[in-house]
Amino acid sequence: MTIATKTPTTPETLDIFQAKAYSPYYFFSTEEWAKFRADTPLTLTADEVTRLRSMGDPIDLDEVRRIYLSLSRLLSSHVESSQILFEQRNRFLSLNGVAKTPFVIGIAGSVAVGKSTTARILKELLRRWPSSPKVDLITTDGFLYPNAELQRRNLMQRKGFPESYDTAALLRFLSAIKAGQPDVKAPCYSHLVYDVLPSEYKTVDRPDILIFEGINVLQSRHLPADGKIVPMVSDFFDFSIYIDADEDLIHNWYVTRFMRLRETAFRDPHSFFHRYASITEEEALGIAEGLWKNINLKNLRQNILPTRPRADLILRKGKNHLIEQVALRKL
C-alpha cells in the first residue's frame, strides 16, 4: 500500500489517484490487492468468465484471481457486518420475525468502461459463497424514458444524461427493495432496439443482495428551493463501486466497440443502428467519434466522473482494459 504526500496547488488539480496523504482512500497495486484474497476459493471457470465478459473486455481468470476474489472477500465481510448490525438492532427494538432488507451494491462508471462485466462477474462470485445468497442484478437502462418520450422532451441527444431517466420510477423501485417488498418490478431495456421494452419487466423478489449498475447511480441531485426532501439513488446503497480509467482510454474503447458492433449486432435488421452497418468504415468511424464527443464525453465530464469520490471502492483500469490500481475508502 502506498500513500504519497505531494500537495496540490489548486483544488482543481485534485486527483485521488495521486494518492495524497490526506486522501480518504487507501491505494493498492493489483499485486498488493491480490494478497487480500486469503483463502477465498476460485469458483468460476475460464469458460464462465469468457461468457460473462462484454465485447472487447479481455478479463480472464487471472484478473478474477487478482482483483475479484479479494473484492468478493471484502463484500462478504460487509454483508456479514450488516447482518450482525441488523440482529443487534432487532434486539434493541425487541423485534422478532423481521426479515432483513437486501444489501444493495451500486456500480458506476462511464459507458464502455466495463461496468456490466464487473457486475456479472460479481453476481456469480457472490451467489457462490458458502451461504448461497440470492443475488439479483438490475441495470438503470430500463429506467430511461422510452424513446418516444425522449423525443417529446427533445432529449434523444442527451440519452444517458441524468435528465433522460425516470428518476421517480427508479427511486420507487429502490424504495420498495429497501422496504423489503416482494415481487418488485424493474422495466427491461433492449440494446438491440435501443429502447425500453413496453410491458416487459424483471421481477426482483427479496434477494439477499442486489447489484444495481448504471452510469449515473452515484449522481447527486440539486436541492429544491422549496425545501422538499429529495432522496438520491446512492442513499439506498450499502456499498458502491466506481469503474475508472483515463478519458482517452475510454474514448478508444468506445470507438473500438462501436466499430465491432457495426460488424455484428448492427447487421441485425431489427437493430436501431442497422443503418450504420451499410456505410463505409470511414463514415462509421466519424459517427462513432461524433457520438463520443457530443454525448458520452460530455456526460462523463459533467455527470459521471464528478461522482467518483462518492464511491466506497474505485477500480482503475489501464490501457489493456485490466485493473491496475484499487482505491478503498477509509473507515
Swiss-Prot record:
One of its GO terms (cellular component) is cytoplasm. It is an enzyme of class 2 (transferase). It catalyses: (R)-pantothenate + ATP = (R)-4'-phosphopantothenate + ADP + H(+). Pathway: Cofactor biosynthesis; coenzyme A biosynthesis; CoA from (R)-pantothenate: step 1/5. The keyword Transcription regulation does not apply. ATP binds at G109, S110, V111, A112, V113, G114, K115, S116. It is found in: Cytoplasm. Its EC number is 2.7.1.33. Keywords: ATP-binding, Coenzyme A biosynthesis, Cytoplasm, Kinase, Nucleotide-binding, Transferase. GO terms for biological process: coenzyme A biosynthetic process. One of its GO terms (molecular function) is ATP binding. Belongs to the prokaryotic pantothenate kinase family. NCBIfam families: panK_bact (TIGR00554). This is Pantothenate kinase. It comes from Rhizobium rhizogenes (strain K84 / ATCC BAA-868) (Agrobacterium radiobacter). The gene is coaA.
